Structure formats: C-alpha cells, structure tokens
Amino acid sequence: KKDFPMKKSLFLLMLTASLSAYATNHEIKMLDNGKDGSMVFEPGYVNAKVGDTVTFKAANSGHWVQSKALPEGVADFLSEDGKDFTLKLDKEGVYVYTCPPHRMMNMSGVIQVGKPVNKAKAQAVVDEMENRAMQSKGRLKKYMAQVK
C-alpha cells in the first residue's frame, strides 16, 4: 500500500491534463481592414467556455486591447502596442474590449463566456461606446446582439 500516494498523484495529474485538453484558445486578430470594415477585431464576437483562452493577434501595428466591461472579479487588462496578448477566461460573463487609439472608429468586440451574468452592465457600456463612435456605428451593437 506504499504506492497509493503515487497512484493518487498520477490519477490527479491525468485528470488535470484531460480537463485542460478540452480548453480552447480562440484567436482574435487586430486588423486595419477585415470583413466588418476598417479598424476591426476579427472575429468581433466570440462564444467561449470558462477555462478557455483568447489570444489577440497583432496582425497590424498600432493596435492593442483594453477591457471596457468585465464580469465581477476579473481584473482590467491593457496590452502593449503591436504585441500579441493572451487572456485566460476564468469567469462567466460578458467581456467587452476596445483598441484605445481606434475606439472612435468602433474598433471593439465582445466575448461571451458561459452565461451572460453581467449582460445589463455590459450592454450599458456598449450603448455608451456606440454613442461616442464616429465611424462604423452599429458594429459593436451587432456583436453584443449575439450574446444569449
């Protein structure tokens, strides 16, 4: 019975590895031009699961990503100019983000993780961002409308 702790450790290691094998990394490109127009995140809406990650890919320079609305308990984030940035999605809810230098061009997006527990707060932020947008009005609302 001396090898029981070893078997238990091995079992827990295998269980952890199998659970992490189901996590997905979603890639979002920061682009000058994309399917939804100029200055855009592609895709602009991602539906993910708790435990997944999102990697914002700096396909063009001059872009970075900043959080605007997050589920309770998630720390604000701000990436560096022209650098890829990976975010672990640990909490259910709606994540709204933008590219600060192109916010007026409505370069923003939405990630839904599980249930949209903070949908009302996220919607209020989206409405405010849409009101301030000078270009591509309606694009962020279109992404938010996919949150179910």
Task: Show which residues each predicted segment covers.
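Sec-dependent signal peptide recognition
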Residues: 7-13
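Short, low-complexity polar/charged micro-motifs in intrinsically disordered terminal tails
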Residues: 13-14, 144
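Extracytoplasmic copper-binding redox domains, predominantly the cupredoxin/blue-copper superfamily
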Residues: 22-148
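Short, Lys/Arg-enriched N-terminal segments with co-localized hydrophobic residues
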Residues: 1-5
